[in-house]
Amino acid sequence: MDQQENNGFGPIFKPRGKAVTFASVVIAIISGALLVFALWESEDKDGINFVFFATALLMLSVIIGELIRRVSMLAEEIRHKQTRYQGEWRRVFRSTFAFEYGSCILAVGTTSVLFVCYALLQNYEAFFRLDYGIFFILNCFVIPQLVFIVGIREPNTVEATMLNERNNKNVADGFAWNYYFGYLKLVLPRLEAQIAKSSEFRYKITKKKLYILVPKTCYVYDNIADADPRVTWAGDLTPCKINRGGIKERIYKQAVYRVAMTDKHEYFFILEYASNLMSLYDMSLHEDAPLSRQERDDQVVLFIRKLREILEGCKECRGKCEIVPISGDEKSKIADVLVAIHNATQVESDEADL
């Protein structure tokens, strides 16, 4: 792990990939192929035909059953037609019956209908039976409702987090976007100019970027020196004034901190905490905003990942900000982390010059 597991913060997990889909496809193909192969070896052609017929019938019943289950959801959404959908029936139906992979479902449903029709035409007497019809009706009208009522269909933790990560619905995603649009996008493009305006710090600051501390605990000290006495406030950059949210010339300023090491060498960093993380910390303690410690730990990792992704995608902000994950549990470590990052980037810069 880089820099001793991100300065004690721990591993930053990667986004979930397509392994679930791949595994499902492999299981379906292997199990289906083994079943057909076994029937083929026994020379049971009727059995093979039944496998294809049953698969198509089951798939069709699953699709129809899901549509019928959504009819019950429609009963609830109708009650909110005016408040949630501005009285538009089109929005009610789209919200209730829309599928993310609608074209794929339509193709599978059409193929299933064709298979069922073909099987009935080939062997009407074998497949047009009352028990098959009862089975089909149960799977369309009864089973989906029971599955929903008893909670079997409720997404598990993995499925819920996959959906949230894919659709930017995590608390951390909102925090990251808010931090970017409400602050970083405004100050980072102006950062070098503000450094140049500062007669006190323009030559002392060797790394012209904003360093943002992200503690795993989400606890943010009001004064960074309380976390590490070697990191002391040295002053502020020249503030920039921006008209924002109805406030004329709202002031945005960044603090400069001095890091004093035992070798009497001093470093100067534009440094601050990701202050909105304190809201995550407060949520984990507030009884009306249930957020477990594990969920909080996951959200702060997602915050780092999303914020890095956002900043990397913005040309005006790219390379002007360094997100520094720290454990937050141990004091007197911030100076060591900052100096290590400074020295590592200095080595990279020297190697690039060579």
Curated annotation (Swiss-Prot):
The chain crosses the membrane at residues 20-40, 48-68, 101-121, 132-152. Keywords: Immunity, Innate immunity, Membrane, Transmembrane, Transmembrane helix. One of its GO terms (molecular function) is 3',3'-cyclic GMP-AMP binding. GO terms for cellular component: autophagosome; endoplasmic reticulum membrane. It is a multi-pass membrane protein. It is found in: Membrane. Its main location: membrane. It comes from the Eukaryota. Pfam families: STING_LBD (PF15009), STING_TM (PF23417). One of its GO terms (biological process) is positive regulation of type I interferon production. The keyword Oxidoreductase does not apply. 3',3'-cGAMP binds at residues 178, 183, 250-251, 253, 272, 275-276. Belongs to the STING family. Facilitator of innate immune signaling that acts as a sensor of second messenger signals produced by cyclic GMP-AMP synthase-like receptors (cGLRs) and promotes the production of type I interferon. Innate immune response is triggered in response to nucleotides from viruses and bacteria delivered to the cytoplasm. Acts by binding cyclic dinucleotides: recognizes and binds cyclic 3'-3' linked cGAMP (3'-3'-cGAMP), cyclic di-AMP (3',3'-c-di-AMP) and cyclic di-GMP (3',3'-c-di-GMP) second messengers produced by cGLRs in response to nucleotides in the cytosol, such as double-stranded RNA (dsRNA). This is Stimulator of interferon genes protein 3.
